[in-house]
């Protein structure tokens, strides 16, 4: 699968593309994730038989660019929570038109790990252009997540959630809520978008165990769900 590095609207991007792709995957990528992207793509390809195009775009400030609202447990910086809409705007106004022009209009999966997973899950309540969300170990422990989720419709057709089975075992009281919150979220999604349109996978270990493989499994589930629903 060819790998292309490009600058799109000032952001560093990496594109992996099969011929005649049927699905577009989008992922915010931090510096710590760049080294494992090749392995992530190989893991996806080893799971699905559907051609796809993957586009990752660089995130330079993980907290600033991905956190949807202020939470001092994420960062004490007051600016954190003000710029997720800027990131979402880059995707909808710059990245998607660019990719669609090159590869055609495709079903879109927005995915991410940790704060990027939170961002992806939040984004599908703000824009209707995403068909599925791949939220691996999303930071759903953010303050007021349940209130937000309960008040906002999910526009995506499919939602994948996962969490390590030891992630909620922590002395950090804020992060310790992630298990209860993701269980609540899964129940909420079953009621709102349907049992066949969402899943919650419990991975082994803590938060930092093979994130790229967890995310690959998330993307693969979304690809399979979207392509099956088209036939």
Where are these regions (language model features)?
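The conserved beta1-alpha1 loop
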Residues: 26-30, 137, 163
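The feature captures the conserved acid-bearing segment of alpha/beta-hydrolase catalytic domains
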Residues: 140-214, 222
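Conserved hydrolase catalytic core segment
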Residues: 122-132
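Short beta-strand immediately N-terminal to the catalytic nucleophile in serine-hydrolase-like folds
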Residues: 107-112, 136
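Catalytic active-site module of serine/aspartate enzymes centered on a nucleophile-bearing elbow/loop
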Residues: 214-231
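Gly/Ala-rich beta-loop-alpha elbow adjacent to hydrolase catalytic centers
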Residues: 111-116, 120
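Serine-hydrolase catalytic machinery in alpha/beta-hydrolase-like enzymes
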Residues: 19-102
């Amino acid at each position: 699968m060819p790998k292309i590095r490009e600058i799109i609207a000032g952001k560093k991007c990496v594109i992996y593309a099969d011929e005649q792709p049927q699905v577009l995957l989008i992922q915010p990528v931090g510096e710590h994730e760049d080294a494992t992207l090749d392995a992530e793509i190989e893991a996806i390809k080893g799971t699905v038989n559907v051609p796809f195009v993957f586009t990752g775009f660089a995130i330079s400030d993980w907290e600033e660019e991905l956190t949807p609202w202020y939470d001092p447990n994420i960062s004490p910086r007051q600016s954190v929570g003000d710029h997720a809409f800027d990131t979402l705007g880059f995707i909808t106004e710059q990245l998607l038109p660019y990719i669609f022009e090159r590869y055609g209009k495709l079903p879109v999966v927005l995915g991410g790990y940790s704060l990027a997973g939170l961002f992806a899950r939040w984004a599908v309540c703000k824009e209707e252009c995403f068909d599925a969300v791949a939220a691996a170990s999303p930071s759903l422990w953010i303050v007021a997540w349940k209130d937000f989720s309960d008040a906002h419709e999910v526009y995506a057709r499919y939602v994948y959630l996962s969490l390590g089975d030891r992630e909620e075992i922590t002395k950090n009281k804020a992060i310790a809520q992630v298990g209860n919150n993701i269980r609540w979220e899964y129940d909420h999604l079953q009621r709102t978008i349907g049992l066949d349109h969402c899943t919650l996978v419990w991975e082994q270990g803590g938060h930092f165990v093979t994130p790229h493989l967890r995310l690959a499994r998330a993307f693969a589930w979304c690809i399979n769900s979207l392509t099956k629903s088209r036939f």
